[in-house]
From Swiss-Prot:
This is Imidazoleglycerol-phosphate dehydratase. The lineage of its organism: Bacteria, Thermotogati, Thermotogota, Thermotogae, Thermotogales. GO terms for molecular function: imidazoleglycerol-phosphate dehydratase activity. Pathway: Amino-acid biosynthesis; L-histidine biosynthesis; L-histidine from 5-phospho-alpha-D-ribose 1-diphosphate: step 6/9. Belongs to the imidazoleglycerol-phosphate dehydratase family. It catalyses: D-erythro-1-(imidazol-4-yl)glycerol 3-phosphate = 3-(imidazol-4-yl)-2-oxopropyl phosphate + H2O. It is found in: Cytoplasm. Keywords: Amino-acid biosynthesis, Cytoplasm, Histidine biosynthesis, Lyase.
Amino acid sequence: MTVERIENGVIVQRNTKEIEISITLDTVHGKLEGSTGVNFFDHLLNTFCHYSGLGLRVSTCESKDGILHHLIEDFGISLGQAFRELFDYTKVKRFGEASVPMNEALIGCYVDLSGRPFFQKNFEFSVEKIEDMPVEGFEEFMNGFVNHARITVHFFKFFGKNDHHISESAMKSFGLAIARALERSDTRTTKGVID
């Protein structure tokens, strides 16, 4: 994986035997440009960008083995690495939370830019696929992102039956929680440092 700093952003390239990914994450555009080739995953990524205010440009997203699991997981790894490189967690609020309704679904997201990776959710999906995306991709993406961004993320389902609504509510709340955690502030840690 290679990382290049640019004005207001970071370019990450990841090339393995399974995938080739090149993305740019920035603090300016607030939308998704390009495509992963998985329509519903693109929809979730664009939702995240819109509510977090972050811009994401996908230059290359290619599966060499045709396995979506690898593509979605490695995309999370790449995006998480870009996020970690782009932000100094000691200069932001660090904590963020949001709850977002979507029809019958209500999902809360709680974020800590702690330097300690941990991901947890209290719900499972009831179907194997949402549109063209395997539902396991949601967790694989989040784990990849969280482990490489080195942040803590909890999702809590208050209500919800429709898996499309649940996943979209979760991504909206994640974006809003990230936006709040990234607000400028002094270091918020008793240790005085975030690794």
